[in-house]
Amino acid sequence: MSANSKDRNQSNQDAKRQQQNFPKKISEGEADLYLDQYNFTTTAAIVSSVDRKIFVLLRDGRMLFGVLRTFDQYANLILQDCVERIYFSEENKYAEEDRGIFMIRGENVVMLGEVDIDKEDQPLEAMERIPFKEAWLTKQKNDEKRFKEETHKGKKMARHGIVYDFHKSDMY
């Protein structure tokens, strides 16, 4: 096949594509805008949060803040510069502990969302910071108390034939 016939074949293919209205390639920025218009119900919804600071609430009630570096189809997450925080809003206190790089299994994620880094510290300015160990012990006591209350409630409801599904790992 000669060079001229190859050029003609290529021109014919280009003309056919234009006639069939093949979409032109879009830039990465346009793709982000296009994808942001859709609500995903899968882990694909997380893609726009990569390399951004996020908040993650775990099933055991822990709250983690960090930069999302990667994730997989099971919503397993890798956070960098991760910080765990415990809030006691009634007493207007909080505690935090650096966790570094943190891997989270997707089955433990209750909720996640992006953090506005410009406003992140505003609520903390009005709160008193306490030692993390003290806060963790207080949280453990509160969780144990809640577990006993929920177990009692479950037994009471079971006597009336109502199933009450509460697990110790569901402290959120």
Curated annotation (Swiss-Prot):
MF annotations from Gene Ontology: chromatin binding; mRNA binding
Organism domain of life: Eukaryota
Result after altering residue 105 to A: Slightly reduces affinity for poly-U RNA ends
InterPro entries linked to this entry: Lsm1 (IPR034104), LSM_dom_sf (IPR010920), PTHR15588 (IPR044642), Sm (IPR047575), Sm_dom_euk/arc (IPR001163)
Cited Gene3D superfamilies: 2.30.30.100
Subunit architecture: Component of the heptameric LSM1-LSM7 complex that forms a seven-membered ring structure with a donut shape. The LSm subunits are arranged in the order LSM1, LSM2, LSM3, LSM6, LSM5, LSM7 and LSM4. Except for LSM1, where a C-terminal helix crosses the ring structure to form additional interactions with LSM3 and LSM6, each subunit interacts only with its two neighboring subunits. The LSM1-LSM7 complex interacts with PAT1; within the complex PAT1 has direct interactions with LSM2 and LSM3. The LSM1-LSM7 complex interacts with XRN1.
Native species: Saccharomyces cerevisiae (strain ATCC 204508 / S288c)
Protein name: LSM1-LSM7 complex subunit LSM1
Domain Sm: 41-118
Stretches the record annotates as Disordered: 1-22
GO terms under cellular component: cytoplasm; Lsm1-7-Pat1 complex; nucleus; P-body; ribonucleoprotein complex
Primary residence: nucleus
